[in-house]
């Protein structure tokens, strides 16, 4: 996002709500973020998409490969768009704009932050300010031993109580070479899961949709 553009200009908040759902895609610091471009392309086929990336996730995301119509917001934008009292606050404007938020991949670190209520970057500030009458999906991605760690179970229970919907990880050979559960679900699965939720309760173009958030915990 260029600093010369206002938050409202990039989000189109001065215009009527579109017929397509507004999806805010976010990536945190996992090697699975290499699939973020694929996620952006899949979601942009049926939704209006904006993207958020943490500093760590940018190690894995090729920004030049993202669809040209998708604006990617980073932590730097949070500060560059605010100069004085009364200016738009990016994480609040993004929260207002989005009908749905999807965090894929969700790293162990960002999961812990959300469960603990921390808000030290753009992504976690959006989640802390999120209106939980609107759906929020997460697709975790981490090493098997991190996934099986007792802290992970506690953190998943906490976000489950918020109404955050889980797209469970899968078992496969991980980037580190280990074999086990913890790999992010395939982009096609994440896309179809969110799209199905939208179809269950069609978008109301006069207001943000209210899609029931699942409360699923992993079987492991």
From Swiss-Prot:
Induction: Induced by dark. GO terms for cellular component: nucleus; phosphopantothenoylcysteine decarboxylase complex. It catalyses: N-[(R)-4-phosphopantothenoyl]-L-cysteine + H(+) = (R)-4'-phosphopantetheine + CO2. The active site is at 91 (proton donor), 176 (proton donor). The keyword Flavoprotein applies. Its main location: nucleus. N-[(R)-4-phosphopantothenoyl]-L-cysteine binds at residues 143, 173, 175, 184. Keywords: Coenzyme A biosynthesis, Decarboxylase, Flavoprotein, FMN, Growth regulation, Lyase, Nucleus, Stress response. Expressed in root meristem, shoot apical meristem (SAM), intercalary meristem, floral meristem, embryo and tip of the coleoptile before true leaf emergence. The record marks 176 as: Important for catalytic activity. Binds 1 FMN per subunit. GO terms for molecular function: FMN binding; phosphopantothenoylcysteine decarboxylase activity. One of its GO terms (biological process) is protein homotrimerization. It is found in: Nucleus. Its EC number is 4.1.1.36. FMN binds at residues 29-31, 54-56, 107-110, 141. Seedlings over-expressing HAL3 show enhanced growth rate under normal light/dark cycles, enhanced salt tolerance and Na(+)/K(+) homeostasis. Enhanced growth is due to increased cell number of root meristematic zone and root cap. Forms homotrimers. Interacts with HIP1. Interacts with HD1 in the dark. This is Phosphopantothenoylcysteine decarboxylase. It comes from Oryza sativa subsp. japonica (Rice).
